[in-house]
Amino acid sequence: MQRVSRLKRELQLLNKEPPPGVICWQNESNMDDLRAQIIGGSGSPYEGGIFNLEIIVPERYPFEPPKIRFLTPIYHPNIDSAGRICLDILKLPPKGAWRPALNISTVLTSIQLLMSEPNPDDPLMADISSEFKYNRAVFFSNAKKWTEKHALPAPQGSDKESQEKSGSSEGTSHKRKSAEIAEESKKPCREP
């Protein structure tokens, strides 16, 4: 019961006072299944992109963190090809920093900040992390191309293309260029 009333309050607050560049809503009639959109921050390679996220609220929320993943493909050292996010507040202690006092709005704001300021020292995508650390211009260019391809709104009149770019189409692939990103470069998020 505490979970349901808290979720209702959080959704009302997110609806009434959303963080800048963040939208969150209930998917269908299931309160445990939320969707969110984060607008890429200005000055970042994700600028102007609309990134869709899936939020699954666990039965033990707020004592367990929500499960969040990107539905829109994104070129980022802390987000893998399945959309999983390496962020300490998405994990329970001792490996993570989730606390019941945190809420979905705080988590979405933290993800938005992670998009602007990647953490190359705790990557999910080692090759992208190396690129970010040692060749920032190439990283920026690649991330910008991914944003243009997958996250920018399509020109008016192209509904199918718009769905594909936003990641909302059921058939959209969340796989990266597998030839360029070798399987061995994908490793689990390092423990702090």
Curated annotation (Swiss-Prot):
Alphabetized UniProt keyword annotations: ATP-binding, DNA damage, DNA repair, Nucleotide-binding, Nucleus, Transferase, Ubl conjugation pathway
Listed Basic and acidic residues bias regions: 178-192
Entries under InterPro entries matching the protein: Ub_conjugating_enzyme (IPR050113), UBQ-conjugat_E2_core (IPR000608), UBQ-conjugating_AS (IPR023313), UBQ-conjugating_enzyme/RWD (IPR016135)
UniProt pathway: Protein modification; protein ubiquitination
Residue span, UBC core domain: 2-152
Classification lineage: Eukaryota, Metazoa, Chordata, Craniata, Vertebrata
Gene3D superfamilies, A to Z: Ubiquitin Conjugating Enzyme
Localization of this protein: Nucleus
Protein source organism: Xenopus laevis (African clawed frog)
GO biological process: DNA damage response; DNA repair; protein autoubiquitination; protein monoubiquitination
Disulfide bonds: none
Cited PROSITE patterns: UBC_1, UBC_2
Pfam families: UQ_con
Ranges where the record places region Disordered: 150-192
Family assignment from sequence similarity: Belongs to the ubiquitin-conjugating enzyme family.
Protein name (Swiss-Prot/TrEMBL): Ubiquitin-conjugating enzyme E2 T
Enzyme Commission designation: 2.3.2.23
